Amino acid sequence: SPIVELGSERAAMAAFVGTVFLHGGALIYSSQEIGHEAPINFFAYTSVDWSECSDIYQEYGCLMGLYNKYPALRKGILTGYPASDVLMYQKSDGKDAFMILVNVRNRDVSVILPEGWKHHVATDIYENKPLELMNEIKLNALEYRIIRF
């Protein structure tokens, strides 16, 4: 399970967000979307309580909804931006531009935004809220942001 492998639900979710929008198909492994920690035997029936972690299930559902809604997130041109504590990349398709930021550390960090993203009003599409971008953005431990410009 990603939760066991990465040490926490938040670390597993950060890893999922960091990789799902990179390029290609979204991979969700058996019961990952409910935070099921025990191994699943693929050759035998395993009962899974789908109400086990409804908040995680809803978070995966929202993220996959965004993945399906915006072609740029699935198939857009990928532009990476190096940062030591944050996985940061842009996905764009000529219609929409998105910045995906994932704090990969178990501590709060700040990251300087790329020039084209500074001093603009954008939208945090996961939270569905306007976001005023300055020179840098602060991310809590293992927090992610999906920003539409």
Predicted feature locations:
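Carbohydrate-interacting/catalytic domains
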Residues: 9-13, 23-28, 32-149
